[in-house]
UniProtKB/Swiss-Prot annotation:
It comes from Homo sapiens. Changing C603S: Exclusively nuclear. Loss of CCAR2 desumoylation. The modification Phosphoserine is found at S57, S117, S132, S157. The lineage of its organism: Eukaryota, Metazoa, Chordata, Craniata, Vertebrata. Its main location: nucleus. This is Sentrin-specific protease 1. Highly expressed in testis. Expressed at lower levels in thymus, pancreas, spleen, liver, ovary and small intestine. Its EC number is 3.4.22.-.
Length: 644
């Protein structure tokens, strides 16, 4: 033992540690013991160097790694350094020998905590140095003489689990897991997304800064697994470190109390992690820190403590604002934040919808006002046009168009009696006799190689539609009348001519004019059947125009073009020369220019009477009210094969 003591004897101000080929020297303080001011200074240096990065620290009382190579591999019991005041530290005597010093419980506790923190700091910053203190090297394992003299003795810990304490305090078995930047980024993104979700639902601002990763992950698992033991040590042991934190124990070293508060707060966070509804987080600028109230051995504390004691300026750590007792009822208003948010959104939507409806009503009112103004302005100008379209009453209607044409020599305008000759009683009896029931196939008139039966005559009775036989017979009578002196020569095509020309082309109808020269007459009459409607097209070689007449006001320029093309082909086929279309015009009479039918059955009568007036070079001066008269008159004319 004397040899061992001689080898371990050192100089007064120096300790030499041998590790492999390297020699590390630590210069000790010249005076004996550890003064509190120097310990506080070292603690302040440690705190200032690590405060910006260390988010969660932990509380543990151990010897300084720089002065005590013989550390505990397992956790010492809480009675050894928490409950009792028999905490021992190594000092240096005047002759260089190590000795124990037993200060007061408060200072000893702070020193032991600072020594433990110093040990952890030394481990984190100087891996090679801590390996030397632990008897390890980077390549080989050497056991120093001091370790042989003072072997490490494990101390059982009743408060903490052995596996967790060994993983925390044993540098030989603990391998710090490095957290990659990708993991930090993912965690930060998840926290930011959750913060935005909370802010959207509750309508409050949540400032949750980026957590630091300097705190080991295995420490959080160990602390969370032993939360029940920590709760007992925090709230039941009056002589423990928890009483110093919650009771805001004042000591001569302010930095030591700050570090202790941070350690205990981190313990409180992990031990109360299951009480998430009772923990309220806020921004670090709130300036207050709330502690729970317990009635075991902790005196009543105020709700607000200065945040400057726990967080340095510019720290990005999460700040625990208030920890509420689980027995305290939580205000129910926070659970209805989503409902209030929905109501607010609904109210905003309702206000927008009401504003939109108001604008729509204003636009409708403005449109109605403008429409009324336009109607009032056009009331006088369109009065005559509206009356013409409606034709009410028909008795007061006058001829729409009065065509002033140069009459040929020997022809004069006749009186109204000549235009509309009166039907005598004898003529009336004959017409009624035709309409009586009889043999429908009885031939009543025959001429122009056409035969008119009683069935055909019945189409002129009342509002029946005219058939092809009646129209073709009447057109032939117009051609026969045109042979009279002073009237324009007329040729009328069959009612099937235009339909055949349109569907089959010129080759299908070129033989229809084998015995007729269409270019030698003045007027060509072309009845046009549109399925259920009769119209008339007139080719006037004198005026060089093709005009379309429709009693319903229809426009059909296509029919006019088809007839003009027919004239070109007919001229080439019959006369062997081109038809000169220079000066020819195509017209479709508008509804304001010719009389319009006021029912759905007189279209055939209107087409025939258009042709009658045109072939006499007379104005079209009849109206809808004349249609019953024209029907009776046409019956008599067909029966006698002569126009009145």
């Amino acid at each position: 033992m004397d040899d061992i003591a001689d080898r371990m004897r050192m100089d007064a101000g120096e300790v030499t540690l041998v590790n492999h080929n390297s020699v590390f020297k630590t210069h000790l303080l010249p005076q004996t013991g550890f003064p509190e001011d120097q310990l506080s200074l070292s603690d302040q240096q440690i705190l200032s160097s690590r405060q910006g990065h260390l988010d969660r620290s932990f509380t543990c009382s151990t010897r300084s790694a720089a002065y005590n190579p013989s550390y505990y591999s397992d956790n010492p019991s809480s009675d050894s350094f928490l409950g009792s005041g028999d905490l021992r530290t190594f000092g240096q005597s005047a002759n260089g020998q190590w000795r124990n010093s037993t200060p007061s419980s408060s200072s000893s506790l702070q020193k032991s905590r600072n020594s433990r923190s110093l040990y952890l700091e030394t481990r984190k910053t100087s891996s090679g140095l801590s390996n030397s203190f632990a008897g390890k090297s980077n390549h080989h394992c050497h056991v120093s003489a001091y370790e042989k003299s003072f072997p490490i003795k494990p101390v059982p810990s009743p408060s903490w689990s052995g596996s967790c304490r060994r993983s925390l305090l044993s540098p030989k078995k603990t391998q710090r897991r490095h957290v990659s930047t990708a993991e930090e980024t993912v965690q930060e993104e998840e926290r930011e997304i959750y913060r935005q979700l909370l802010q959207m639902v509750t309508g409050k601002q949540f400032t949750i800064a980026k957590p630091t990763t300097h705190f080991p992950l295995h420490l959080s698992r160990c602390l969370s697994s032993s939360k029940n033991t920590l709760k007992d040590s925090l709230f039941k042991n009056g002589n423990s470190c928890a009483s110093q934190i919650i009771g805001s124990d004042t000591s001569s070293s302010g930095s030591a109390s700050i570090l202790t508060n941070q350690e205990q707060l981190s313990h409180s966070v992990y031990s109360l992690s299951s009480y998430t509804p009772d923990v309220a987080f806020g921004s670090k600028d709130s300036g207050t820190l709330h502690h729970p109230h317990h009635h075991h051995s902790v005196p009543h504390q105020p709700d607000n403590l200065a945040a400057s004691n726990t967080q340095s300026e510019g720290s990005d750590s999460v700040i625990l604002l208030k920890v509420k007792d689980s027995q305290t009822p939580t205000p129910s208003s926070t659970f209805f934040q989503a409902e209030l948010w929905i109501k607010e959104l609904t109210s905003v939507y309702d206000s927008r919808a009401r504003e939109r409806l108001r604008q729509i009503e204003e636009q409708k009112a403005l449109a109605l006002q403008l429409q009324n103004q336009r109607l009032q302005e056009r009331e006088h100008s369109v009065h005559d046009s509206v009356e013409l379209h409606l034709r009410v009453p028909l008795e007061k209607e006058i001829p729409v168009t009065v065509v002033q044409e140069t009459q040929k020599k020997g022809h004069k305008l006749t009186d109204s009696e000549d235009e509309f000759p009166e039907i005598t009683e004898e003529m009336e009896k004959e017409i009624k006799n035709v309409f009586r029931n009889g043999n429908q196939d009885e031939v009543l008139s025959e001429a122009f190689r056409l035969t008119i039966t009683r069935k055909d005559i019945q189409t002129l009775n009342h509002l029946n539609w005219l058939n092809d036989e009646i129209i073709n017979f009447y057109m032939n009578m117009l051609m026969e009348r045109s042979k009279e002196k002073g009237l324009p020569s007329v040729h009328a095509f069959n009612t099937f001519f235009f339909t055949k020309l349109k569907t089959a082309g010129y080759q299908a109808v070129k033989r229809w004019t084998k015995k007729v020269d269409v270019f030698s007459v003045d007027i060509l009459l072309v009845p046009i059947h549109l399925g259920v409607h009769w119209c008339l097209a007139v080719v006037d070689f004198r005026k060089k125009n093709i005009t379309y007449y429709d009693s319903m006001g229809g426009i059909n320029n296509e029919a006019c073009r088809i007839l003009l093309q027919y004239l070109k082909q007919e001229s080439i086929d019959k006369k062997r020369k081109e038809f000169d279309t220079n000066g020819w015009q195509l017209f479709s009479k508008k509804s304001q220019e010719i009389p319009q039918q006021m029912n759905g059955s007189d279209c055939g009568m209107f087409a025939c009477k258009y042709a009658d007036c045109i072939t006499k070079d007379r104005p079209i001066n009849f109206t809808q009210q004349h249609m019953p008269y024209f029907r009776k008159r046409m019956v008599w004319e067909i029966l006698h094969r002569k126009l009145l």
